[in-house]
């Protein structure tokens, strides 16, 4: 099928001007995820904040009740017993100076990064590498911790980090098209709840302004914000 015809087909039945209840929006997106691979279901939340101001930054981490469907590679900066704990918990890459050297050389073989507090002076050297990728360990979201086993299991088990972008948007994957619709709805509501709880002191007016759901290759469907709470 030609790309133009394919796009026309998957867009049929979606009113671009309408705000759909969350459960209906998810159903529409799932029905149109027709690629040969299991598409990721993504959510975009527009917030009434200006992240250029420190008191309007929004970030956090949420454990999705039904996981993400992704295989997440976890890297841990730790030594001694904590390194052993990380390996036992299923971390894919564990190290100290050796791991720093790997990352500096451009070998980043992980998707999420965790560090013990004593490692941060060393890990701090990697700010220019990990920072732009949103992978720098941060105590505010539980990735600088002595509980490395818990952090590794959380990252592997469906925890999602979120951070508002320059345009005031949070984007996150919340599951796969193969998930049951009700499980995707539960995940989206869990994300929205976490975003609400992370509302900064400097936010004024309507906080969650717009919500949209889409699949990797599909069109976005606008959601009535009141139905995600």
Swiss-Prot record:
Record carries keyword DNA repair: no
Keyword Nucleus attributed: no
Cited Pfam families: Ribosomal_L1
GO CC annotation, single: cytosolic large ribosomal subunit
Gene Ontology BP annotations: regulation of translation; translation
Highest taxon of the lineage: Bacteria
Subunit and partners: Part of the 50S ribosomal subunit.
Family: Belongs to the universal ribosomal protein uL1 family.
Function field: Binds directly to 23S rRNA. The L1 stalk is quite mobile in the ribosome, and is involved in E site tRNA release.
Protein name as it appears in the record: Large ribosomal subunit protein uL1
Species: Rhodopseudomonas palustris (strain ATCC BAA-98 / CGA009)
């Amino acid at each position: 099928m030609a790309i133009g015809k394919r796009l026309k087909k998957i867009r049929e039945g979606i009113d671009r001007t309408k705000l759909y209840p969350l459960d209906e929006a998810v159903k529409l997106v799932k029905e149109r995820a027709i690629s040969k691979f299991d598409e990721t279901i993504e959510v975009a939340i527009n917030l009434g904040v200006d992240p250029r101001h420190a008191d309007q930054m929004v970030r956090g981490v949420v454990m999705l009740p039904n996981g993400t469907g992704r295989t997440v590679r976890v890297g841990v900066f730790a030594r001694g017993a904590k390194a052993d704990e990380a390996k036992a918990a299923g971390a894919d890459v564990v190290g100290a100076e050796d791991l720093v050297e790997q990352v500096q050389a451009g070998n980043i073989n992980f998707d999420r990064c965790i560090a013990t507090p004593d490692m941060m002076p060393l890990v701090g050297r990697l700010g220019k590498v990990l920072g732009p990728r949103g992978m720098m360990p941060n105590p505010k979201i539980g990735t600088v911790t002595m509980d490395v086993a818990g952090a590794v299991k959380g990252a592997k088990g469906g925890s999602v980090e979120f951070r508002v972008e320059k345009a005031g948007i949070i984007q996150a994957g919340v599951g796969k098209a193969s998930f049951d619709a009700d499980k995707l709805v539960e995940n989206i509501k869990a994300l929205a709840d976490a975003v609400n709880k992370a509302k900064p002191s400097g936010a004024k007016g309507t906080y969650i302004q717009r919500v949209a759901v889409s699949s990797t290759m599909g069109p976005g469907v606008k959601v009535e914000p009141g139905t995600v709470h």
